[in-house]
Amino acid sequence: MKILDQKGKEFLLNSIRCINDFPKPGIVFRDITTLLNNKEAFNFLIDHLAARYEDANIDYIAGIESRGFIFGAALAARLRLPFVPIRKPKKLPFITLSQKYSLEYGVDEVQIHIDAFGEKAGARVLLMDDLIATGGTAKASVELINQTNATCVEACFLIDLVDLKGSEKLKSLTKIYSVLEV
């Protein structure tokens, strides 16, 4: 599977706005809206991901609410694959499976429709999100996919905040690909 070269990484990184001290002091927020608003950068990213996954024998692409929907749905459309949303509680209208995960000061949860990957066990799923930080949501999402008897073959992120070690939480569950590591 293809990995982006340094020139491509710099192009994408330069298309993402960094906002200091948002949402609180000491945080550098990676604002992907500038990448989304740049048709060359957005299409470059989706082209790269399509080239990486076109021969990966993937059956579905799942995206984590909400920015994972953007990249996941765009990639699914490009690869002509079905897209499955992984959502926050009480957002899906049909019967759901749930996975709770810990936050710094509490617990949150992700959900998926019970029939999201069809009747056949063993569907091969690519999980997409814009960013991995501490890894709690991504880990819960992989576990949720596994609850459906599908297999998360890889988790893909536009950005990995490596100092927060979120990818470390996933390594025992699935392969990980981050386009950019910051």
Curated annotation (Swiss-Prot):
It comes from the Bacteria. Its EC number is 2.4.2.7. One of its GO terms (cellular component) is cytoplasm. Pfam families: Pribosyltran (PF00156). CDD domains: PRTases_typeI (cd06223). Its main location: cytoplasm. InterPro entries: Ade_phspho_trans, PRibTrfase_dom, PRTase-like, UPRTase/APRTase. PROSITE patterns: PUR_PYR_PR_TRANSFER. GO terms for biological process: adenine salvage; AMP salvage; purine ribonucleoside salvage. Keywords: Cytoplasm, Glycosyltransferase, Purine salvage, Transferase. Signal peptide: none annotated. GO terms for molecular function: adenine binding; adenine phosphoribosyltransferase activity; AMP binding. It catalyses: AMP + diphosphate = 5-phospho-alpha-D-ribose 1-diphosphate + adenine. Pathway: Purine metabolism; AMP biosynthesis via salvage pathway; AMP from adenine: step 1/1. SUPFAM superfamilies: PRTase-like. It is found in: Cytoplasm. Catalyzes a salvage reaction resulting in the formation of AMP, that is energically less costly than de novo synthesis. Homodimer. Belongs to the purine/pyrimidine phosphoribosyltransferase family. This is Adenine phosphoribosyltransferase. It comes from Campylobacter concisus (strain 13826).
